[in-house]
Amino acid sequence: LFNNMNVLENCTSGQMTVLKRNKEEAKKIALENLEKVGMARFIDAKPAQLSGGQKQRVAIARALSMDPDVLLFDEPTSALDPEMVGEVLKTMKNLAHTGLTMVIVTHEMEFARDVSDRVIFMDKGVIAEEGTAEDIFVHPKEARTKEFLHRILTKN
């Protein structure tokens, strides 16, 4: 997020600059997306006034405001306080139920199992196994996948 802009400005700037939307249209779309992620009441707040989870949700609203075909998430919860992880995962789960295509790099295995149509398990930067969530989480074929899932899922 741009620290010199409030939440609303962060969600309208790209729309007006890149998509050439007028201010009123950009504001309407931004407010709709901020509402989707539970951040509409923070439109006047600056990023410094928000928690990590709130910043992440504003960033999601900003991205949605650009009408993407695909939304990419690279470890969206890795830098968050553990208490804030749930609010971001809930937001992403709600987006998944809208049919939005998302590519998510995550170590949140329960979340991945619950929302994924397809799962790719990577080991040392190489695809080790891919399939449906059931293929990977219930019937993994590769020893490395089984080992990782056992270690991660039994830890929680």
Residue ranges of model-derived segments:
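Conserved ABC ATPase "signature" region
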Residues: 12, 23-42
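Conserved ABC ATPase signature
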Residues: 46-50, 54
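A short, proline-enriched helix->beta-strand linker immediately N-terminal to the Walker B motif
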Residues: 65-69
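Catalytic Walker B motif of ABC-type/P-loop ATPase nucleotide-binding domains
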Residues: 71-74
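ABC ATPase "signature
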Residues: 130-131
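C-terminal boundary and immediately downstream tail of ABC-type ATPase nucleotide-binding domains
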Residues: 134-156
